[in-house]
Amino acid sequence: MPAIVGPIYIMSVTDNAAASFGDVFAISPKSVAHSGAGSGTFQLGDFVKINNQTSKTLFKDADITDETVSFNG
């Protein structure tokens, strides 16, 4: 009996790529990382023009521990 797969969604195409096929209940991460960057930092493309004037990024992680990934098989 043929199966009908729902939409295919590709979240990223890197070494830690993620993709889902059809109906997905939960996607569990296998690794975690934090990054703090100011406005206009992750702009990609040709002829990008960024006008930020004065910009400040406050990256403070106040909690002691984040969600663990030890149970994500």
From Swiss-Prot:
Organism listed in the record: Bacillus subtilis (strain 168)
InterPro entries assigned to the protein according to its UniProt record, in alphabetical order: Spore_germination_GerPA
Protein known as: Spore germination protein-like protein YueG
One of the Pfam families matching this protein, by short name: gerPA
Gene name, Swiss-Prot/TrEMBL: yueG
Superkingdom assignment: Bacteria
Family to which the UniProt record says this protein belongs: Belongs to the GerPA/GerPF family.
